[in-house]
Amino acid sequence: MLIAPLGGAEAYMAYVSNEKDNTVSVIDLDKLAVVRTYPVGQRPRGITMTKDGKFVLLCASDDDTVQVIDAKTDKVVRTLPSGPDPELFVLHPSGNPLYVANEDDNLVTVVDVETEKVLAEIPVGVEPEGMGISPDGKIIVNTSETTNMVHFIDEKTHEITANVLVDSRPRFAEFTADGKQLWVTSEVGGTTNVIDPATHQILKRITFQIPNVQAEAIQPVGVRVSKDGKYAYIALGPANRIAVVNARTFEVEKYLLVGQRVWQLAFTPDEKYLVTTNGNSNDVSIIDVAKQEVIKSITTGRLPWGVTISKD
């Protein structure tokens, strides 16, 4: 049992999927160190926690399944029917169901986490990847990489209610905490579009310029917006930077240098830290959110892809 640090702060654990090693690294964010690593299915990518924090959900992409892992024992206890090549997913705010992007079949699969049954298969664009859900759970969003669209899906009917064209290869979708904005990154387009979910209009198209970094190396992927709506943090892939964006003015305020090919990112629940996965340098970066600076690099397995964080 880990003892909380002085001052009564909770200890958080980060779970990192290592795509090339077929493992998950567990990082104690009090010690800022990997405390254990365990084997999982083939090509692990998307990763999240169940609402109660008891289980890790993991896309084992080459096994065509979602694995359910006991967070205490690190053992796979069951699998969920995900459809082929699951890459990213999003869990309903209530904890059930799970919405899974199936890249090979151009579908979003809706899975009941408790009964392990497929509730629906929703046809979307070509190469679906990014998944988002509104805070009230009423709107599900999928991005299709080849169609270059954001698909808005009704929770009850599982029907697409709107399609929004964005820049090339949209990778990730993140609602703000108030549900009034949707941030969508476009990897090849090199941009991030902020969309009004109510009107489906693009509010702002954010571009990035980094001194001494070629434009084609700036490839936005993961994005997270702080709960207070003040800042967005965007992973810029081979540019090896996190863009810190003022979420009210949409201006880029700074770039934080992290590891190589930064891909995904996650806040600790208290938003003290932001953890980034850096695929080509086989590590994660720990960002002090208040100071907006990188304080630590931690070696993981090979090709760290996704990250999720919960209380220990």
Tell where the protein language model's regions lie, with residue ranges.
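Predominantly soluble domains enriched in secretory-pathway, periplasmic, or organellar proteins
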Residues: 1-312
